[in-house]
């Protein structure tokens, strides 16, 4: 699932009333997930779908006109034949506590075959072979076929109330049936379970005195020369062939950081394997997150993934476990990553449940995990957590960036209707929550996190931030759901002043796009970043050509 899409534009009323009645929620969800009308944005000319070097057809996230040579689609009915109204049915769900220890089974995978079109594990997953004409059923003789019997039209249809499905048979509007669909709503109840994760020792409290953190002089925004889709990173038809190599058919995000010189980690969100189908999230072989590695320096022709962390042959494993229980912990989603010395860190959010309204979700907390074996296994720190009390936590979805003596933490609340806050911590104390200083009105203060001053005006989500050593400037990319765009800002210091947002990607051009995660080897002139598209539920590499201010 990663981050749920925001549709084409965010709904202000949805942001103000997240607890609206179920029917209103369903109506809003339907409205927000409908693509923008054609009148809002011209479609790009039709083009055949992309094909990788093995002849496999991939996905094109661009908003294109339909194939002019294809037969016209059947007309849509004026009204659906049935409207389903979900009815929550509470169900007591025992949840053993503490959490079970993670399964850290890992293998050292064999190198990929030299031939990129050769599947590394054909005994597990192989390219479907075309049907054998000799075994195909022969068409029957039309002369011997009989017409199917058609039931007589009574001129009426059953409904939930008198006349709700009536029709005179003379072309009158047929009203849809109303059906109430039971939907299990788990009510988690903690119960004692077997021994699980051992408690960790608490770090000593550290409170650093307040220090000045004034705004730096504003810089001019870069001029955007061009933005182009470089290529599909994951899924069927991608150059990486992640479906055949690692059972990654559908996934999202693609959060990147440098693990060591010459290597970049790529973290993905909710991932599904063989059996996933086009149309969004869900499917077999659900893993909350997976991790790949890349040494590809030439991004102009795409992002190559060399390998992934695996628990068995050709199977990318889940790194940060989750309980997968709605209203307790549905999933755990990476939000950023960074390295300090030999240790890797990953920020993540523990998702309590996804909302019926796109762009909204509830978290339990935002947390930090670390790895001392270059990302093969991870430990969730039990104290470096920012709890989401009453849904008001400001640092639930974070992007963390080491620079100088500090690690800077940019954060937003759960969902896509919050503002950006900022904190910092010394590198040696990154797992000690009490050592963090929050940027409050020009001061680095040992304050309560909710007092952090918003960095910029407006809503933001899915932050990605990097410090560009060449220009000595900060780059920040995020989804502005109110604007319906992935935007970029720059600043001379993490607290700003930040430039106005420069639009990189519009959801008019890339419907239901989200993300915007910067490749760490970008520059002030060449910005490479990943986006996700909801319906094809996979990751794409984008390239923005910039003209920075001189």
Where are these regions (language model features)?
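Blade-level signature of beta-propeller repeat domains, shared across WD40, Kelch, NHL, RCC1
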Residues: 516-550
